[in-house]
Amino acid sequence: MVGVNLKYGLHAPSMETVMNMIPEAYVKRGQISAKGEVKVDGTLEGNYGNKQLPAVSLNIKINDASARYEGLPYGIDNFTADFESYIDLMRRNPSFLNLKILHFEGAHTKILADAKVEDLLIDPLITLHTESTVDLDALAKTFPLQENVTIRGKLDAGLNLKCRLSSLKRQDIGRIRLGGRLALKDFELKDTAKDFNFFR
């Protein structure tokens, strides 16, 4: 068995790198002009070997980023995100995901959200807050979507959600705390390659 205590960090990734992480099944590769600061760091700590695995933490911060695909009328005017996670498969400490903030502005769209998933390896407890107005018609002209992907419509949401994943799976309404508003207009998400279609 080996004791591991490792810190890692990447300061080099750019917003362009982040944009290129969007799966090519949905978005074509293209020329991107992008700005902003991206930081990635974390730790690997614990024992490895003899059925033991170290715990892993990952932190991602994106500050004041912007991006635009060449030839498209809209772009991302401002994008900020602060995400942290901790995974301990040996369950010595609680595992979690924590999106402290996600702020997106551009293409007639404004998204402000935070979310947390606690008890990640047991029965995840999900907490989500968002205030968002989304113009999918404009977003469809922000990213070079593949021909099989269609997004359109408008969404206005101000939501607070708290529940266990098991309650969502069972559709146990009595155990799902959900409040706020959600308005959809001419809303459609479609991927013909995966035979997926959601519209309202």
Where are these regions (language model features)?
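Membrane-proximal interfacial segments on either side of biological membranes
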Residues: 1-100, 109-200
